[in-house]
Curated annotation (Swiss-Prot):
Originating organism: Spinacia oleracea (Spinach)
Name of the protein: NAD(P)H-quinone oxidoreductase subunit 3, chloroplastic
E.C. number(s) listed in UniProt: 7.1.1.-
Family: Belongs to the complex I subunit 3 family.
Membrane topology summary: Multi-pass membrane protein
Keywords annotated in UniProt: Chloroplast, Membrane, NAD, NADP, Plastid, Plastoquinone, Quinone, Thylakoid, Translocase, Transmembrane, Transmembrane helix, Transport
Subcellular localization, as worded in the UniProt entry: Plastid, Chloroplast thylakoid membrane
GO BP of this protein: photosynthesis, light reaction
Assembly and interaction partners: NDH is composed of at least 16 different subunits, 5 of which are encoded in the nucleus.
Amino acid sequence: MFLLYEYDIFWAFLIISSVIPILAFLFSGILAPISKGPEKLSSYESGIEPMGDAWLQFRIRYYMFALVFVVFDVETVFLYPWAMSFDILGVSVFIEALIFVLILIVGLVYAWRKGALEWS
C-alpha cells in the first residue's frame, strides 16, 4: 500500500521554500521607496561615470573559451562523486569513467585542432 504521509516532509519543504522567496519579493516591493530620476535611471559601474554605449559586441573566441570551461567544469562535477566512491563501485564503473574521460579528451583535441583555444 502506498502511504502518502511519508511525503509530508517533502511537501512542507516545497511549500516553505516557495513561500519564502515570494514573501521576500512582496515585502521588498511594498517597503522599497519609489524614486525615479536621472540618477536612478543611469547605469552604475563601480562609482565610475559610464562612457559610451552599454551594448558591446564580444568576439566569438570568448564564447569558445566559456564553452570549453563549462565542459570541463561539468566533467569535474561528474568525476568528483565517482572518485569519492571509487572503492565501492568496482571495475565496471572505472571503465565507464575512463570512456567518459576519453570522449572529453577527444573533444579537447578537436577544439585544439580547430583553434578554439588560441587567444590571438
